[in-house]
Amino acid sequence: MLDSPYVRRVAISLQLLGLAFEHEPLSVFRTFDEFRRINPVVKAPTLVCDDGTVLMDSTLIVQYAESLARRSLLPAEPKALQHALRVTGLALAACEKSVQIYYEHTLRPEEKRHGPWLDRVTAQLLEACGALERELVEKPIDSSAGGIGLAGVTVAVTWHFIERTIPGNVPPERHPALARFSREAEALAEFAAAPHGPGTFGSD
């Protein structure tokens, strides 16, 4: 489902790489049994390759896709790659923590939530977003389709997920560069074709 930031990350990256794909909007919760028939591990995103091989994890799927496209969404120059990997790592950390907070509030009954754990995860999320804000201020990322790259996709998708699912946890006024970059990226055709939500890639 495109309500998963990891699924969106892959869908957008595949488009940027010029690779055609079919999207089956399955949920690890709402369509668990159907998902399990495709991948018994029930992990999103899952990619079924042309030969039937099943791949998991957004980073690994994008890595495989890059081999098919024979080009990378990461820069080759070591210093530029170092920066892109740092930004990508921070964005993935923020993504992981935001998903944990979202699940805690939507799946676990209130009386069973562990306050200290939620506080710790929220603190980690804020640190990651704060670091991302500083990175974008010091070294802005190109938000065009030709320049956004994997780091930019990951940042934009993560911030959009935060805004849509746990908006009260990360104040946008304290992260103006993040918010602005995400808005610019969401205006790209590749992002618009894979909107956050329960829909299908490419549907109007």
Region spans (language model):
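Aromatic-glycine hotspot motif
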Residues: 47, 59, 125-133, 190
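GST-like domain detector, emphasizing the conserved glutathione-binding G-site
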Residues: 1-115
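Class I S-adenosyl-L-methionine
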Residues: 11, 15, 133, 163, ...
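C-terminal end-helix/capping segment
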Residues: 173-194
